[in-house]
Regions:
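Active-site regions of oxyanion-processing enzymes, predominantly non-cytosolic
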Residues: 1-17, 234
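A conserved hydrophobic secondary-structure block that centers on an alpha-helix together
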Residues: 5-7, 37-40, 45-47
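Aromatic- and acidic-residue-enriched carbohydrate-binding clefts of CAZyme catalytic domains
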Residues: 16-33
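Secreted, luminal/periplasmic, and some membrane-associated catalytic domains
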Residues: 33, 44, 48-249, 258-259, ...
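Polar, surface-exposed loop/tail segments
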Residues: 191-193, 201-229, 290-293, 297, ...
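Low-complexity, glycine/alanine/valine/leucine- and proline-rich hydrophobic stretches
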Residues: 237-240, 244-299, 304-306
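Intrinsically disordered, low-complexity regulatory segments in eukaryotic proteins
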Residues: 339-357
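Short acidic, low-complexity intrinsically disordered linear motifs used
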Residues: 351-369
Length: 369
């Protein structure tokens, strides 16, 4: 697995892209080829691998990315601000309201967040992750909630978002600690209301409507862990448009960030939905092009190439367009029950050393802050 292509795009995009608002010609002259050079090195290593495998004549190679990359632009969507404007989320007043415990939690959380921001760029992700584990779980959970929702009045909140992704949760009675929305009809009607109204959000500076669609979670996902997903998933023009409203006090739930706000961000490139899929080998159609491939199609395709049956419950399908006609034959499907799985799941445990290794790997990839 290669992670350098991800990291370099996040941190060097502004030097590579003349249309980026923070593009500087002098900096570009020094760092502008950094992304290209990383890809060149990856290409050379892939070439070396193919040279070794070509002699065998029976090996297929798939090059896959889980997403693409693009400019982290000035567009911003503040979901909690929009929810508040619809009367669906309440904020605590800024005049000292709230219990003493709430005030102390908020002060502690803000102090922790300021400390984390001052450490980013100075200390490795792995070290920060180890420091976090020194804190009691209960304290981390409480401060984490305050970091995401420092000003939310839960008694007047029917829906909310952590604002870092296109996710909306319903403050459901019986599930959430201070839930006020009744399961059943009230829950369904509230989701319907948000689905109908949110795509009408307009950025007044550009006239654009950045929300493409709002999905119910069961429209996109299924399985025994569906309840862990947000109640609604918001699809926008770009996945990086969702931003915490933070210190922004204006009325615009969709807006353009000013240069000073953009300059505060360490990353200048972000993910895009379209990644890459490149296939090479004796079973592949030379010069073929795929128009409707998705990431979930990779696993069933690999299983088929290995001569293994594909579970009927698995998402995705075999990318037959990429295969020679003779390689498409012999496609087999099988139920999980036939494979011996009863649907109850498998209990997996790690030693402390294994768990530490997994955490460090995830931190090194940037998934743990």
């Amino acid at each position: 697995m290669v992670s350098a292509t991800d990291g370099v795009a996040h941190f060097f995009w502004k030097y590579h892209d003349p249309t980026h608002p923070l593009y500087d010609p002098e900096e570009a002259a020094r760092y502008g080829d950094t992304i290209l050079e990383v890809y060149r090195r990856c290409d050379r290593r892939i070439g070396e691998l193919l040279e070794r495998l070509e002699a065998s004549g029976d090996c297929n190679v798939l090059v896959v990315s889980d997403h693409g990359q693009g400019q982290l632009g000035p567009q911003a969507i503040h979901l909690n601000l929009w929810l508040a404007q619809q009367g669906l989320l309440g904020f605590r007043s800024n005049n000292g309201g709230g219990t003493l415990g709430e005030k102390l939690n908020s002060l502690a959380s803000h102090a922790v967040q300021r400390g984390k921001r001052s450490l980013y760029g100075r200390i490795r992700f792995q070290t920060l992750t180890k420091l976090r584990r020194l804190w009691p779980d209960s304290l981390r959970t409480r401060l984490g909630a305050e970091a995401f929702f420092p000003d939310v009045d839960w008694s007047h909140t029917r829906a909310y978002s952590e604002e870092l992704r296109g996710n909306i949760w319903i403050n459901l009675r019986g599930r959430d600690p201070q839930g006020i929305v009744e399961p059943g009809k009230e829950y369904d009607l509230l989701r319907d209301q948000i689905i109908a109204d949110l795509p009408g959000l307009v950025d007044p500076q550009t006239g654009a409507r950045p929300i493409r669609k709002v999905w119910r979670r069961e429209e996109l996902f299924n399985g025994p862990y569906l309840g862990r997903f947000p109640d609604l998933i918001v699809e926008a023009d770009y996945p990086d448009m969702f931003k915490p409203h933070g210190a922004y006090l204006g009325p615009q739930a969709a807006r353009q960030l000013i240069p000073e706000e953009m300059a505060q961000r360490a990353i200048t490139g972000c993910h895009r939905m379209n990644g890459i899929f490149i296939a090479w080998g004796p079973d592949m159609t030379p010069g073929g092009r795929l128009n409707d491939a998705a990431l979930i199609d990779v696993a069933p395709t690999v299983l088929h190439l290995l001569g293994q049956p594909i579970p009927q419950e698995m998402d995705g399908h075999v990318l037959s367009q990429a295969l020679r006609p003779e390689a498409r034959a012999g496609l087999r499907t099988v139920s999980l029950a036939e494979l011996g799985f009863d649907g109850a799941g498998v209990e997996v445990s790690f030693t402390d050393a294994e768990a530490d290794y997994v955490r460090e790997r995830l931190a090194g990839l940037g998934y743990l802050g």
